[in-house]
Amino acid sequence: MNDILNIIKGIHPGKFLERELKKRNINQRQFAMAINEHPQTLNAIIKAKRSMNIDLSLKIEKELNFDEGFLMTLQVFYDIKITNKKNQATPD
């Protein structure tokens, strides 16, 4: 997964999840129910309106057989990217 991580770091984990669900032909609502999560919560993450949290990332990673911590690592890289953009936009 490290090679993939280097390619996609800076992308919101929800966008990666959306692509993965489509690739596997998994319905977003059914997936939310399978991991015992509210569909609205999952949708907000997929739309990048909400950050990934540890509990949810572990559920998703287990269900989709991702390496543990993969989605949270994506979230951290995304947060770094956003913070860097904000810092560049505001002068010291």
Regions inferred by a protein language model and the residue ranges of each:
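Short alpha-helical DNA-recognition segment
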Residues: 26-44
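Residues within the helices of the helix-turn-helix
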Residues: 18, 29, 58
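Residues in the recognition helix of alpha-helical DNA-binding motifs
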Residues: 20, 34, 45-48, 74
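A short, Lys/Arg-rich alpha-helix, primarily the initiator
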Residues: 2-26, 73
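The alpha-helix within a helix-turn-helix
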Residues: 21, 32, 61
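DNA major-groove recognition helix of helix-turn-helix/homeodomain DNA-binding modules
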Residues: 55-70
